Amino acid sequence: SSTSRGLGDVYKRQLVDSEDAWDITLGSSNIKVAIIDNGVANNHNDLTIYKQRDVSDNDNDASPAVYYNQNGGWSHGTHCAGLAAADINNGTGIASLGGNAEIIAVKATPSSADGGSIYNSYNGIQWACENGANVVSMSYGSANQSEAIQNLINNYPDVIFIAAAGNDNVSTIFYPAGYQNVIGVGSVDGNDLKSSFSNYNAGLF
């Protein structure tokens, strides 16, 4: 049932047709989803971590610098990892669309820096692609584009790249969402209308 599977509000399930999707598959451990972000709680009991890397601090611990705080929870990266691949039917947290998929956690923010910014996007994307990512999720962005990152993405035609449109309610194209071969994703509300904060332009999904 949808209750035991744990995904939240009914409209969210209907919007993405999660019930129909779950009837087809609950995901596969053969699929590796890379989360490029400010850290992923690597011992979270609702996530299966396949590999992890802190490309900013050059170590193999992708956990956030501040492991948990009341306002930020388990970090933005952990939140994104849960949406992508939280386990299904385990009585914990939410259920994602592909709960059997495994996470490649890539921390691209130095522990000494502001946890709200991504500093090493290129290195994070490259490491994820070199270490088995089938999907690369990038929930960050700015108006600055990089030819080097575009070329890097082009070098991995078999990888699906997904990026956030941004949360500033502007039509400005943000990157990495604006790169070629990247699926840019905006936000909608409970009425399937653009969320008040979501960036918007013709290239978004």
Report each predicted region and the residues it spans.
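Active-site core segment of subtilase-fold serine proteases
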Residues: 4-5, 9-135, 154, 161, ...
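Catalytic-core regions built around general acid/base machinery
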Residues: 145-161
